[in-house]
Amino acid sequence: MLYNVSIMVNLWSALASRDVRLLKNQIDKLNSLPENCWFVNYLRCHDDIGWGLDEDVERYLDIDPLKHKEFLYHFYEGATPGSWSMGELYNYDEATRDARSCGTTASLCGIEQALDKNDKIALDYAVKRDLLLHTAMAFLQG
């Protein structure tokens, strides 16, 4: 049994980019495994999010891996227009432009930002994002 970090990063990627192609590819791979293969699916844990997406699949889908990774870690630190997230950038490497993201599920889904701004509409959307991700967890093979 393994931790399924790939599903975790692909769920967060799909949520921010509003593009489910990488997630669908990962779910198709997961569903093609023998029935005796099991994973622990999760949204967040005590660790940072290392954006280890499948770069070959990204290129096949005409997604630039580095630009996509930069979008994700900037989105989840709240530095991208339209971001609802209040996560934190972690371990940025200027030479490789690699970085990781930190934050709770609530912070990354926008609950923290909505509460800080006392924005009931934003809070409703943030809770719906959180529920969407948790619903996916309930139905993914694991």
Predicted features along the sequence, with ranges:
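Active-site and adjacent substrate-binding regions of carbohydrate-active enzymes
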Residues: M1-G142
